[in-house]
A protein has these predicted regions:
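Hydrophobic residues within beta-strands of alpha/beta enzymes
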Residues: 97-99
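Acidic/aromatic-lined carbohydrate-recognition and catalytic surfaces
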Residues: 1-87, 91, 104-164, 169-171, ...
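Conserved alpha/beta catalytic core and glycan-binding cleft of carbohydrate-active enzymes
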Residues: 6-39, 139, 143-321, 326-329
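Short phosphate-binding/catalytic loops that engage adenosine nucleotides
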Residues: 94
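Short glycine/proline-rich turn/loop motifs
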Residues: 59-74, 121-123, 231-240, 341-350
């Protein structure tokens, strides 16, 4: 609920009349002599600002891809429509929600530049999220309006919440039932680019982060433990060296996860040990991966080196078709799937 699609009716109407009612559903700002209003960098690289079609000095905000315009949570009408949508789904019988990218809904309304942190002169947008105050008001309102009346289970994608404010986020009095334990499984991320990441996951760092996380969480509630999700490479490849991949190593990885205190989350394919596949550049679909490949090339890496790094860390690894059996396309479809099937599907599949 941080953003919608650029194909959504609201956004289409906003682009047709940015000064009208639907323009207030988004963050549309005047630029600086045709340049973006701020120097914030999107999560996928490049400016968070995109020009409104037909206007030289109007821009809309997108923390992620330009096809994902951020919704204006400061607009009460927008919040009411979001709550109405959530409650509609709860009325259909849903038990709860995974709430994605939720920490991005509160913006710095001063719209000030940040100290650049890269050669592009931009600064990561998450630094804005980390310094603004008042997100709790939105989260509590959403909880009281949408989740409490249904006794819903909610899992927030809230990264790197400080220990002293954890009780505000999880437990009976928290904004959510629980949040994902990202810190341990992100221990390999030693910088902001793929080429700075470790491979495979450094075990000692993972162990240290896991024990630390478990210790601080127990005072407030419990976390949702993960090894992988749709935004990461396959855990079977990230945590296990390729030469050690097999039944026993996968079983050990599963045991470590399942024996931790908290709520284990299994991502589709994880239960059978689905792993990363080998990629060609033309096969990548993920915008983040494509951008990271080019960042590696611009840093002086060869095509082969950049492809290897991109293949290791690409989110596309977690988005290949589920491997049901050894039939064509792993039994996923008789038609050509939108992403290529992992080459090992004849060995690694549900059947």
């Amino acid at each position: 609920v941080n953003h919608c699609s650029s194909q959504h009716e609201w956004f289409q109407k906003a682009m047709a009349d940015p000064d009208g009612e639907y323009g207030t559903y988004f963050y549309i700002k005047e630029g600086k002599n045709g340049q973006p209003p701020t120097n914030w960098r999107s999560y996928f690289g490049g400016s968070v600002w995109e020009k409104v079609p037909g206007y030289e000095n109007k821009f809309y905000l997108h923390s992620f891809a330009k096809e994902q315009p951020d919704l204006n949570w400061e607009n009460e009408v927008v919040r009411e429509k979001i709550y109405e949508m959530i409650c509609w789904w709860m009325d259909q019988g849903l038990a709860g929600f995974r709430i994605d990218a939720i920490m991005n809904i509160k913006k710095d309304l001063i719209w000030s530049d940040l100290e650049p942190d890269g050669p592009d002169g931009l600064a990561d947008v998450y630094k804005v999220t980390g310094k603004v105050k008042g997100i709790g008001d939105f989260l509590l309102e959403m909880k009281h309006r949408c989740f409490e009346p249904y006794d819903a289970l909610t899992v927030g994608e809230a990264m790197f919440v400080k220990e002293e404010i954890l009780p505000q986020f999880i437990g009976d009095q928290g904004y959510f039932s629980t949040i994902f334990a990202f810190e341990p499984c992100h221990a390999y991320r030693k910088g902001k680019n793929y080429m700075d990441y470790g491979w495979p996951q450094p075990f000692d760092d993972w162990k240290k982060e896991t024990f630390h996380n478990q210790k601080i969480i127990e005072k407030a509630g419990f976390e949702a433990n993960i090894i992988e999700n749709h935004d990461q490479p396959r855990g079977a490849s990230l945590f296990i060296p390729e030469e050690d991949y097999g039944f026993y190593s996968l079983s050990a990885l599963a045991m470590i996860m399942l024996c931790q205190r908290g709520l284990p989350f299994l991502y589709q394919g994880q239960e059978i040990g689905m792993s990363n596949r080998r990629w060609e550049y033309a096969e990548f679909n993920d915008l983040e991966t494509i951008n990271q490949y080019h960042i590696a090339r611009e840093a002086g890496m060869s095509e082969e080196q950049a492809l290897k790094i991109a293949s290791h860390h690409s989110r596309d690894n977690a988005r290949t078709p589920m491997q049901w059996n050894h039939d064509e396309n792993a039994g996923f479809s008789t038609e050509k799937p939108w992403m290529p099937v992992n080459e090992n599907y004849k060995i690694v599949n549900v059947k």
